[in-house]
């Protein structure tokens, strides 16, 4: 059970354990991360610093700020667990893996931003209640630019979400560019008048859509990894396969004379 919410501790989600102590820590001038960190912390600091800079959080990272100490607990706690000890002059972060250290920094950022830089001293022990904390995005029915997806991943990281469920294939499009079957994305990535896929779900005013190259996918996966997020690409078959069958109709049994209509109004959109 999580401890009851206290007004002076504004964290989402609320930690498993919060033990308040006397005094406050002044983070109004930011906090100072190690300049020569151990190898396992270096990637973390780069990812967190980049995240801070992308959203222009003022007075967050400063050599004049409160010193942050990192301690690796060497598998003594779960990978996503962390301990945060807040003193008046310093903050200690303890964890066993990348995600734990990252979530501790996110918690510290939340506390700083919600408390105008002044946060209570105390000890936080936290670990996720759920191993899968996900966000789903349907890019088959509506195409999202890569930069929009990267921004979504950033926002997920602020809430300590760790799974990106990426829906890429459906009746309306086959978004992945495959070198083995390039015509799949080339013919179904755009929909509208005169296209292989008709104008539905916002595609009626003209061809709309797009595809994701191997480079796009690699960029998204790498960005997600730096934020402690795993990517789960979803390719939907054998149902919801209209786009696939428009390009490779032989994947449907020609002897099958059944006529089914999906909820969305598509017929003969299953592989059999």
Describe the role of every protein-language-model region.
Residues 75-268, 272:
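Feature activates predominantly on carbohydrate-active enzymes
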Residues 1-133:
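Acidic, contiguous N-terminal accessory segments
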